[in-house]
Every structure is written in structure tokens, then in C-alpha cells.
């Protein structure tokens, strides 16, 4: 909790909720809870910490990091679980699941942007996150 003021835990919970929603819609997600926690463990923890005062920072960092992993396969394929027992993306089904979840997170951020009155795509680029 102290490292991210609870932001990492909230991001993991968000990932699990997105996964559950996708499974309910009939999509196959081959990422375990430990895989999701491991993914978020490698995200920008400073951005997650900003969730204490800027609630959307957790959603935005989760979406940003999933998108980053999708677009950077060399980085993604080199990530290990926090206990170093295995690579997170150790089979192609996990990569496909990452893509499915990344698209769902993109849609969530788009819906949030519209609900908050940001009608132009570039307006949300002013969020206080770093890459």
C-alpha cells in the first residue's frame, strides 16, 4: 500500500473486473489473476500513486500500460512474474488476451472521456501521467 497508496491494488481489481466482464460477454481471457497482478506490477507506479488525488489516474495508467505492452512486444515478452518463476506472456493465448483487454480498456477510457464532457480525442492527453 505504501508504495502506491493503494493504487496498484485498485489497478489489479480493475483488471479483474474487466476480465470478468469480458468472460461474461463470451470472450476467452487466458490471463490469471496472478498474471494480471504481475502485469500491473511492472506499470508506472508513480502514475498509480497519483490515483490517491486523481481518481482517473488508475484507469488511465492501466489503459496506457496495456496499450504500451500491445505495441512493444519485445518489452512485453521479457516481463517476468514478481517472484521470477516464469515469464508472464509464456503462450500466444495470453498475448491475444492482452489485446482483448487493451481494447476493452480503450473503450472504457473513451466512454469516461465522453461522460466527462471531453468530446475531442486530444483533450484527455492533458492528464498528469508520465511514460
Region locations from a protein language model:
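Glycine- and acidic-residue-rich phosphate-binding/metal-coordinating active-site segment common to enzymes
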Residues: 1-9
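Acidic, metal-dependent phosphodiester-chemistry machinery of nucleic-acid enzymes
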Residues: 131
Amino acid at each position: 500500500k505504501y508504495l502506491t497508496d493503494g493504487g496498484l491494488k485498485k489497478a489489479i481489481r480493475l483488471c479483474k473486473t474487466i476480465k470478468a466482464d469480458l468472460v461474461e460477454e463470451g470472450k476467452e481471457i487466458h490471463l490469471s489473476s496472478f498474471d494480471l497482478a504481475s502485469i500491473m506490477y511492472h506499470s508506472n507506479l508513480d502514475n498509480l500513486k497519483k490515483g490517491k488525488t486523481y481518481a482517473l489516474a488508475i484507469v488511465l495508467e492501466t489503459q496506457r500500460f496495456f496499450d504500451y505492452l500491445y505495441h512493444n512486444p519485445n518489452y512485453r515478452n521479457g516481463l517476468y512474474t514478481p517472484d521470477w518463476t516464469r515469464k508472464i506472456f509464456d503462450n500466444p493465448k495470453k498475448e491475444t488476451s492482452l489485446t482483448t483487454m487493451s481494447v476493452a480498456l480503450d473503450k472504457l477510457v473513451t466512454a469516461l472521456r465522453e461522460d466527462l464532457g471531453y468530446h475531442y480525442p486530444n483533450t484527455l492527453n492533458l492528464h498528469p501521467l508520465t511514460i
